[in-house]
């Protein structure tokens, strides 16, 4: 059985699965996988649709896993598109539509490669496919739910490949072997409102906020590591909601976003920021409240057997030697890393989340070939 990955991508694009909606995307995959002999289970939780599929024996010591998502971001202004966002139109060698790059093509390429493998040369082992509809959203009931189901059901993956688009410009140029952690901290500084002509009768929260933001932003977190760039902290907002120039506001709010490497944890950075907030509160005689959300901790899959396997397949199919990287934002690999070794590889992500998102059709077939080689080499 040979499955056309580009056609499957088009079928998925026609599902308007704007997160958290599914619009039949997982039904498309379940039908294809079931016909190839995969045991499929819906792992829906919290209104989110998820699919777990396994070919082969449960708990097999040699189990290759794949993780991806079928939910997509909103299309924005549909009138700005030159094609229907969910029409899966082909034009000049490209397939257009929301999710074409991120990441319905990656899901389709792996499913097609896996179906070809198990129906033509069944391996000694198991192939596991985990697909969520909650990667672009809050990511609370997506891959987390799938991993919870696996733990409770005795399912396991020896290794996992996440099919996010990892290549910035050229097919095959980059494999992700880790990701930086991400966290956001919100600060509220409370003083005493007053007339700007009588500042001694007020307690202005703005100088305190400015001092706090300066202390945080001017502090070099680290110099990076062998596999990670230096951690970064960005001031993303400072706001009082005050439009009156003769009023000293009572409150000021600010926020920072930190992308951190494995020299830090969310807890260690929270402790550092709380210490800075306490010092500023004491210096200015104001109250400083901090709230934190840790979206994900940093992680690294050290270069070795898994990254070598993927890199060899990429080079064999593209002629490009991939760089092992930890750059970019977060992905669901941050959850998978607690289950098994994980790396990420997919196609060029230049148009993801953009108007007229599109994927080169030849790249879909090339990605299927890469995934197929990875699977064959893993089970060899």
Swiss-Prot record:
This is Succinyl-diaminopimelate desuccinylase. One of its GO terms (molecular function) is acetylornithine deacetylase activity. Catalyzes the hydrolysis of N-succinyl-L,L-diaminopimelic acid (SDAP), forming succinate and LL-2,6-diaminopimelate (DAP), an intermediate involved in the bacterial biosynthesis of lysine and meso-diaminopimelic acid, an essential component of bacterial cell walls. Zn(2+) 2 binds at residues 102, 136, 353. Pathway: Amino-acid biosynthesis; L-lysine biosynthesis via DAP pathway; LL-2,6-diaminopimelate from (S)-tetrahydrodipicolinate (succinylase route): step 3/3. Zn(2+) 1 binds at residues 69, 102, 164. GO terms for biological process: diaminopimelate biosynthetic process; L-arginine biosynthetic process; lysine biosynthetic process via diaminopimelate. Its EC number is 3.5.1.18. Belongs to the peptidase M20A family. DapE subfamily. The active site is at residues 71, 135. It is an enzyme of class 3 (hydrolase). Binds 2 Zn(2+) or Co(2+) ions per subunit. Pfam families: M20_dimer (PF07687), Peptidase_M20 (PF01546). Homodimer. It comes from the Bacteria. The keyword Phosphoprotein does not apply. It catalyses: N-succinyl-(2S,6S)-2,6-diaminopimelate + H2O = (2S,6S)-2,6-diaminopimelate + succinate. PANTHER family: ACETYLORNITHINE DEACETYLASE, N-ACETYL-L-CITRULLINE DEACETYLASE. Coiled coil: none annotated. Its cofactor is Zn(2+); Co(2+). Keywords: Amino-acid biosynthesis, Cobalt, Diaminopimelate biosynthesis, Hydrolase, Lysine biosynthesis, Metal-binding, Zinc. InterPro entries: ArgE/DapE_CS, Bact_exopeptidase_dim_dom, DapE_proteobac, Peptidase_M20, Peptidase_M20_dimer, Peptidase_M20A. The keyword Ribosomal protein does not apply.
